[in-house]
């Protein structure tokens, strides 16, 4: 799989991913649940580029070579000690990670069906493949940009970052504003990503809540952030007792694993209506809050606060996390809307780690099957729905009382 025109010695010097911690925290929190509750689950992930007109085929060899080197990595003793120090990580999980590597036999990279497209499929045990998604997307991004943007305008990026931070730092009314960096998968490069985190830590003070990237959290002494992702609730469509109960099943298993820790529920795998039907008084009181990742965030927040009141949970004690394509101005609008009514937190990704004046890639890698059965995400944004089985998608919509596409 190594690119023919780059020697192994040269290639190791330019590896994009050099640590298995260079990923998002929620991958580890989900992986621990998989180890303890679903160790035999088999899954399939599929890559998709939503940005039209992107030709990645000239870089296939580079991507394959980077992924090959990714699959040689192991966790170091220092990294394992860091994970062991996180309050919600259990010792048997760290012991498992001490033996872990990403299995190269489970990832398939080739040409896609459309001109310029590439195909990336991951297929195998969920426990052993869950850590592919984030570094593979980061590899695709960085390979593309280092070939198409050979002379990045770093100063422009720094000016843009400073202007964003100033929106918060220059406004005394935003004393309680907290923002986290969530941009690993779509970053321009790992070097730029690290500069973003170090700059925000140095200049934003208490306004900088932390980062989703575990490696950068460890290096810079900031808080690693994250709970659950869409794939967890999707997989439970195949792992739970029946489809209609899959969302409740997922939340109950999560609560059983973490006993009140990591208590931010993801709301948009089936859309907000279905989420609120399942998020009853028990879950309202048990979970610390919920995360918005599609649809109108203002409407979502108002509906959730009303739902808490209806279920006799004090909204002021709950946290609303916003993470859908956020910018600083949008986050500030939301902070003002919900000030004093609940706790709010913001995760900003691409707008932080890939804003140097050119169009970022809109790429994803989503779970499409679990234990041989189709799974789907039907979010509050129709363009984010991803499923390779129209019949299953229609059935899921019927079961969860969702409108037709």
Swiss-Prot record:
Keyword flag Transmembrane helix: no
Tagged with keyword Lipid biosynthesis: no
GO molecular function: nicotinate phosphoribosyltransferase activity
Domain of life according to the entry: Bacteria
Modification after translation (UniProt): Transiently phosphorylated on a His residue during the reaction cycle. Phosphorylation strongly increases the affinity for substrates and increases the rate of nicotinate D-ribonucleotide production. Dephosphorylation regenerates the low-affinity form of the enzyme, leading to product release.
Gene Ontology CC: one annotated term: cytosol
Pfam family, one: NAPRTase
Residues annotated with Phosphohistidine modification: 230
EC number: 6.3.4.21
PANTHER family in alphabetical order: NICOTINATE PHOSPHORIBOSYLTRANSFERASE
Family designation: Belongs to the NAPRTase family.
NCBIfam families in the record: NAPRTase, PRK05321.1
Job of this protein: Catalyzes the synthesis of beta-nicotinate D-ribonucleotide from nicotinate and 5-phospho-D-ribose 1-phosphate at the expense of ATP.
Protein name: Nicotinate phosphoribosyltransferase
